[in-house]
Amino acid sequence: MKKKNVVVFGGGTGLSVLLRGLKTFPVSITAIVTVADDGGSSGRLRKELDIPPPGDVRNVLVALSEVEPLLEQLFQHRFENGNGLSGHSLGNLLLAGMTSITGDFARGISEMSKVLNVRGKVLPASNRSIILHGEMEDGTIVTGESSIPKAGKKIKRVFLTPKDTKPLREGLEAIRKADVIVIGPGSLYTSVLPNLLVPGICEAIKQSTARKVYICNVMTQNGETDGYTASDHLQAIMDHCGVGIVDDILVHGEPISDTVKAKYAKEKAEPVIVDEHKLKALGVGTISDYFVLEQDDVLRHNASKVSEAILEGKPRTSSSIQ
């Protein structure tokens, strides 16, 4: 039986968690990773070396790598002191070095993938740095991925500059050949949408015959999705990309423990309400189950259970967009 081709879009911790589960299945993975990050070590390297931010890519490489734990630990090591080194992750520096050697960010990732024995392919959403801007409901424009959630305003839309940003040809080819396309999980406006907004990506996904699944976040995110239901998350993606971008939405449809809710409430986050009637009205199928793991009062998607549901390929509901 031929391996399924799975293309996954995202960034941040959520994507890495999913990929660790997905790589245990007999699938061919292409991860397309956001390059809008402008904070921390990534932001500094981006500014000083004029390269796309390596942090999200680093986490994805580690998630898909098959190396000794010590090498993984080394790649993720963050310096705590040292003039100029403090705060930097060794993996970010190695990716910056490989980009310098090869003269190309995507090629640098490809070479680093060999070093880390990566299972699958890791591609940046674009081969150049992109700047994410948020237009707020009151009309103000906030520039920079890390600044948008701090603005304390309701987000109307996000957009990228430069406007002539291009996707990688390899990425478009992977979308064309995909059997399953997965969007998320991750911060809606600052991890998920920056990938989709690279010109040509939304169109390629909509034209693809693959099953398109959006993995909805389990909790809202302060400064980004306050008060959002599952349909609000999906509506935001459709507002930016149009109809036909998602066939099925995967949601955690069970209650969350009071202790976990209390911990997240301190960060002004609350469980995302699954409003199935509105999801149906948007024309998508709903995959609902107990999809999370609670560890130390922190929620993470149960990667193997989520992967199984995505790959199951059960028939789309009659209401889904074809």
Swiss-Prot record:
<dbReference type="GO" id="GO:0043743">
    <property type="term" value="F:LPPG:FO 2-phospho-L-lactate transferase activity"/>
</dbReference>
<dbReference type="GO" id="GO:0005737">
    <property type="term" value="C:cytoplasm"/>
</dbReference>
<keyword id="KW-0520">NAD</keyword>
<feature type="binding site">
    <location>
        <begin position="217"/>
        <end position="219"/>
    </location>
    <ligand>
        <name>NAD(+)</name>
    </ligand>
</feature>
<comment type="function">
    <text>Required for morphogenesis under gluconeogenic growth conditions.</text>
</comment>
<feature type="binding site">
    <location>
        <begin position="263"/>
        <end position="267"/>
    </location>
    <ligand>
        <name>NAD(+)</name>
    </ligand>
</feature>
<dbReference type="InterPro" id="IPR010119">
    <property type="entry name" value="Gluconeogen_factor"/>
</dbReference>
<dbReference type="InterPro" id="IPR002882">
    <property type="entry name" value="CofD"/>
</dbReference>
<dbReference type="GO" id="GO:0008360">
    <property type="term" value="P:regulation of cell shape"/>
</dbReference>
<comment type="similarity">
    <text>Belongs to the gluconeogenesis factor family.</text>
</comment>
<protein>
    <recommendedName>
        <fullName>Gluconeogenesis factor</fullName>
    </recommendedName>
</protein>
<feature type="binding site">
    <location>
        <position position="13"/>
    </location>
    <ligand>
        <name>NAD(+)</name>
    </ligand>
</feature>
<dbReference type="InterPro" id="IPR038136">
    <property type="entry name" value="CofD-like_dom_sf"/>
</dbReference>
<keyword id="KW-0963">Cytoplasm</keyword>
<dbReference type="Pfam" id="PF01933">
    <property type="entry name" value="CofD"/>
</dbReference>
<feature type="binding site">
    <location>
        <begin position="300"/>
        <end position="301"/>
    </location>
    <ligand>
        <name>NAD(+)</name>
    </ligand>
</feature>
